[in-house]
Each structure stands twice: as C-alpha cells, then as structure tokens.
C-alpha cells in the first residue's frame, strides 16, 4: 500500500492547497489513491484533467481516483459520471479533515460538493513546505466578488475572503524557518 499521490493542475493556490489535501488524506489513512486537484479556468484545463484521470486509471487500475478543485466544484456531475472516478470532493470540503476520513466508509458519500458561495472562511492551515518545490506559495486571499461574464473563478472559489494578516505572517515565518527564501509576490 502506498500513500496518496496528489496531481496538481492550475494555479499557485492549488499548489498550496494540494499540501493540505496530502496531509488530510495521509492522516485519514487513505492508501492507493490518486487525488486530482483540478483547474477550471479554461475548457482546455478541464479537458486535460479528464485526460489525466483516464491515463492514470489505465496505469494504476487498482487505485482510487478522487477529483477535487475548481473543475470538480463547477461541474461535479461530469466527473462523477466518469467510470474511473471513485469520489468527487468540492473546493471547501477538500480543506477539511473530516471528508477525507469519511470518504470510503461503507455509508460514505461519493460526491461531497456544497455551495461554495456560502463559504466565509479561508483555509486556515499552515504548511511546512511544498513537496518537490524549491519555492513555496502562501494563501492570502481566495475567491472573487466580481462576476465578469467571461470568468468562472467565483463559481469555483466562491466569494472573496482574506486570510488574517497574522496568519499570513506566521505562515511566512514557518516557511522561512524551513529553508524557503522570501521572493517577490505574484498577484
């Protein structure tokens, strides 16, 4: 049995969140699983996620394939209908330990996606670093209050909410203490 693998697609925020997902899945004892943290910013991003899911299903037929992220939040039915997918978890739910612990319980739900617009808090998690990366990313904000006609972000991430400044500073200090250097900000 092996620890869960996390395949991260999309933005830097997904990279940050993938570390929390990895910790939650490992703490829950999830084994032989591949978790796809997807992007929905373009139709191509969603297509590539579906393609990656099918490829991994062929390569690891016994693995549980779990889909989360913006594409899963925006269109959970599309992923639930894929025979290869074992479970679909929404963007808010992926950040909590409980869904990962209950995921494959005999009476557990296979689709855990709720109303992202009702979420008011941010991640509230500290990470030690980002696996396989020399640069770390931190969350300072999530979501968007604008509803531009061309943009799907609010529907995947919810309304705008900020991480309290003290938590941002504590996260930066932890990462610096773990060997990461302060770089320029990308917004």
Question: Which residues fall in each region the model found?
Answer:
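Proteins enriched for Cys/Gly/acidic motifs involved in redox and nucleic-acid/cofactor modification
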Residues: 1-184
